[in-house]
Amino acid sequence: MKLFGFGSRRGQTAQGSIDHVYTGSGYRIRDSELQKIHRAAVKGDAAEVERCLARRSGDLDALDKQHRTALHLACASGHVQVVTLLVNRKCQIDVCDKENRTPLIQAVHCQEEACAVILLEHGANPNLKDIYGNTALHYAVYSESTSLAEKLLSHGAHIEALDKDNNTPLLFAIICKKEKMVEFLLKRKASSHAVDRLRRSALMLAVYYDSPGIVNILLKQNIDVFAQDMCGRDAEDYAISHHLTKIQQQILEHKKKILKKEKSDVGSSDESAVSIFHELRVDSLPASDDKDLNVATKQCVPEKVSEPLPGSSHEKGNRIVNGQGEGPPAKHPSLKPSTEVEDPAVKGAVQRKNVQTLRAEQALPVASEEEQERHERSEKKQPQVKEGNNTNKSEKIQLSENICDSTSSAAAGRLTQQRKIGKTYPQQFPKKLKEEHDRCTLKQENEEKTNVNMLYKKNREELERKEKQYKKEVEAKQLEPTVQSLEMKSKTARNTPNRDFHNHEEMKGLMDENCILKADIAILRQEICTMKNDNLEKENKYLKDIKIVKETNAALEKYIKLNEEMITETAFRYQQELNYLKAENTRLNAELLKEKESKKRLEADIESYQSRLAAAISKHSESVKTERNLKLALERTRDVSVQVEMSSAISKVKDENEFLTEQLSETQIKFNALKDKFRKTRDSLRKKSLALETVQNDLSQTQQQTQEMKEMYQNAEAKVNNSTGKWNCVEERICHLQRENAWLVQQLDDVHQKEDHKEIVTNIQRGFIESGKKDLVLEEKSKKLMNECDHLKESLFQYEREKTEGVVSIKEDKYFQTSRKTI
C-alpha cells in the first residue's frame, strides 16, 4: 500500500491517498476478535486487566485475531492507567500488529501523547517502520503535533528516516502542506537537500503542491534553486508548467539576489546576465502577442514543460549551438554577453537560457527595426552586413532544424527515457507500471512523431520563404542608400549650373539610374506587399491547423492521463491485496508452526494423561462400586424400616377402629335398652308433663350440645377419610419412588459400565441424592400424617366419651325428673 503519489496536478490524488492511511481514530474493534484482557484494555478497566493477569500471566502479550496486544488497544484508546500497568509488568513494548505498527506508532497515530511519552520513557524504539515504511515521526508530522515530534526526536528518532517513496519527514511535511512542521524540522537541522525517488528536492515539491509559504521558508534557508530532477527540470520549470506566476516570481527574485551577491566576483557582466535571464524567463511564459514565426516555433517545441527532453537544458543548448560546427555562438549578437560570465552557477543558468534565446529569435520577425537601422547606418560596410546576415540566416535555419530534429528525436526517444526513469509523470509505482505505461504512450509517441514531422516540413518551407523575402528586403534596403546618394548628387548638380558639360552628362546618367532604381524599388515593394499578404493568409491557415492539432493533443493527453490513473489505481489495489496476502500468509505460517508445536506438546500430555486416567478410572470404579453397595444397603434398610413403621401404624389404626366399633355396638345395645325404658316411662312422663316443662329448657341445651357433638363427629370422620386418602397417596408416592430408585440404580449400573461418561454418573448421583432428599421429605410428611391421625383418633375417642357421658347425664336428668314428678 502506497501512502501518496504525484500523479495529479498539485497533489490532489496524493493528498487523498495520504488521508487513507493517516486518518482515523484507531482500530476497528470487533468483540468476537478479542479476549478478556483485550476487552478490559479497550474499556480502560485497569482492575480487570490486573485480575486477568493474576489468573493467567501469559495473557500479558496475548494476541487477538488481528495480532494486537492489550498494549496496542490501550494506546489506541488513550487509557494511560492500563498502559502504565502493562509496561510495569514488563510486557513486549515493540511488538507489531498486522500492519507492522508498534504501540508507539499507534499512540502517535491516534495523537495520544501521554501514552507515547510513557512508551518512550520505558525504551520504545521510535525508528521502527510499519508496512508503509512510515516511522512514528511521519505520523507526528501528518498530525502536525510539534510536541510529539519534539519528544520523538529527544528520544533518538531519526530525522532523516525514509518511507517507501524515499520521503524524509521534511519532504512528507511539504507534501502534506504542513507549514508549521516544515519550520519546526528545519529548526531541528533537517536536511533541506534531501530528494525523493524522482530526485525532486524540497523546493520542487513545494512548488508542485502550490505552497507559496513553504517556498518562501525554503528560499530563506538558501536552498539550491538550480537543482534538477531526473528529467532535468528545476523548481522554476515546475512553476511555469503549472502556471504558478507568484511562485515563479519568488524564485526569480531569489535568483536575482544570488546574482547580486556574486556581483563582486563577476563584475559588470552580471547585470547583462540578469537582464537576459529575466527577459528570457518572461518570454518563456505563454503570451498572446506572439505572431509571425512564433507559431512555427511553438509547434516545433513541446507546449508543456512537464514533458522535458532527455538531459539538462544547458547541455542541449551547447549541443544545438555547437552541433553543426559551422560557426561559433559569438556570431549571434544576443549571445555575446552570456559568454563573458565566469561564475559557474550564473554561467549554467545563462547557458540554459541561450537555447531559449535562440528559440525566441525564431519567434521574432526576421527583419527587425534595429537591424534596418543598423543597415542604414553602415553604408560603408554593406557587403559585410550582407554576408553576416546571410550567415546569421543560415545559422538560424540550422538551429531551427536542430531544434525540430531534437524535438522529433525527443518524441522518438521519450519512451526510452521513460523506461530509464520508469514514468512520464511522477506516479506511485514507476517500476511496476512500466509495461502498462509503455503501451499507453506508444500510440501517443507515433502521433507526436507524425505531427512533428509535418510541422517540421511546414516550418522549413516557411523559413525558406521568409529567407527569400528577407533577402529581397535587404537588397531593397541596400539600394535605398545608393538612390539617396544619387538624389543628393543630382540636387548638388542642379545647384551648380555653371559646371562643365561632363558634370551635366553625369547628372543625367545618375537621374536615369535613379529612375531605374526607383522603378525597381517600387516593383520590389509591390512584391513585398503581395508576399506579406500571402504570408498573412498562410499564417491564418496555419493558426487554424495549430488549434486543431492542439485540441487533438489535449484530448489525447486527457485520455492518456485517465488511462494512467486507472492503471495506477489497479496496480495500487493489486499491490495492496498482494501485501495483505503476504502478511496473511506469514501470519498463517507462524500460526501453523505454533499449532504444530502445541499439537506435539498436547500429544505428549495426552499420553501421560491417559496413563493417569486409567489409574484414576480404576480407582473411581472401585469407589463407585463400594458407594453403590453402601447406598443400596442403606436404601434397603430405609425401605424395611419404613415398611415396618407403616405396617405397625396401620395395625394400630385397625385395632383402634375395631375397639371403636365394639364400643359403638355396646353403646347401641345400651341405647336400645334405654329406648325400652323410655317407652315404659313415656306414659309416666305424660302424666308428669308439668314437671317436664321446667326441664325442657335444660333439655334443649343438651340437644344443642348433642348436635354440636354430632357435627364434631362428622368432621372427625371427614378428617379420618382425608387422612386415609393421604395415606393412600403416600403409599403411591412411596411406590413411585421405589420405582424411580430402581430405575436410577439401573442407570447407575449402565453408567458404571461406561467409564468415559463421568458427567452422567455425577448427574445420576445428584438425582440419587435428590431422591433421598425426597424420601426424607416424604417420611416427614408421613410422620405428620401419623400425628394427625393419632390426634383425630384421640379427638374421636374423646367425642365418644363425651357422648356417652352426655347420654348418661340425660338419663340421670330424666330419672331425677320422673322421680320428682312421682314425688
UniProtKB/Swiss-Prot annotation:
Each ANK repeat, start to end: 66-95, 99-128, 132-161, 165-194, 198-227
Keywords attached to this entry: ANK repeat, Coiled coil, Repeat
Keyword Repeat included in the entry's annotation: yes
Pfam family, one: Ank
Biased composition (Basic and acidic residues): 372-384
UniProt entry tagged with the keyword Oxidoreductase: no
Coiled coil: 431-480, 571-724, 776-805
InterPro entries documented for this protein: Ankyrin_repeat_domain (IPR050657), Ankyrin_rpt (IPR002110), Ankyrin_rpt-contain_sf (IPR036770), CC144C-like_CC_dom (IPR039497)
Region: Disordered, residue numbers: 301-343, 355-402
PANTHER family: ANKYRIN REPEAT DOMAIN 36-RELATED, ANKYRIN REPEAT DOMAIN-CONTAINING PROTEIN 20A1-RELATED
Protein name stated in the entry: Putative ankyrin repeat domain-containing protein 20A3
Lineage, broadest ranks: Eukaryota, Metazoa, Chordata, Craniata, Vertebrata
Gene it is expressed from: ANKRD20A3P
